[in-house]
Amino acid sequence: MSDEEAAVVEAAQVATAAYCAGDTDAFLPYIHPERTTFGPDGGRLASFDAAALRAGMAAGSVQAQVEWEGLQATIHDNVAVSTGYLVGTWTIGGDTREGRWRETIVWLRGGGGWQVSHLHVSECLA
């Protein structure tokens, strides 16, 4: 793994740890302001809403206790793609599920480092 790929993997791990800790101040710098998501709830394409995330985490209706498995990254100039599995529990809208999810992230490199531009999470059935 190259140093650049390792930096993206580390960004994913640090951002996920902040999310799991409910630390939005540590999580949000990793999120591009125009991020889109296909989330773990199986819903339609959604734009990121930082205020909704903060409110959901404060209320306990949005939370996760997940860990990465098989996380890897590929770099294409100022764009990176990371893929891996998240294993554990995820609560969205008060509905808690345990399992394994496939996650693909498109990252953009900017002045502040790597930020998530698009995230696709889906349940792994295999």
Segments and roles (model prediction):
Residues E5-A11, T24-H76:
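A solvent-exposed, acidic/Ser-Thr-rich amphipathic alpha-helical stretch
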Residues A15, L53-R54, W68-A73, Y85-G88, ...:
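Hydrophobic/aromatic beta-strand elements that line small-molecule binding cavities or substrate pockets
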Residues S61, T89-E98:
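Short, cysteine-centered beta-strand-loop-beta hairpins and adjacent loop/turn segments enriched
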Residues A64, D77-G88:
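A short hydrophobic beta-strand element
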Residues E98-A126:
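Short beta-strand edge/turn micro-motifs at domain boundaries
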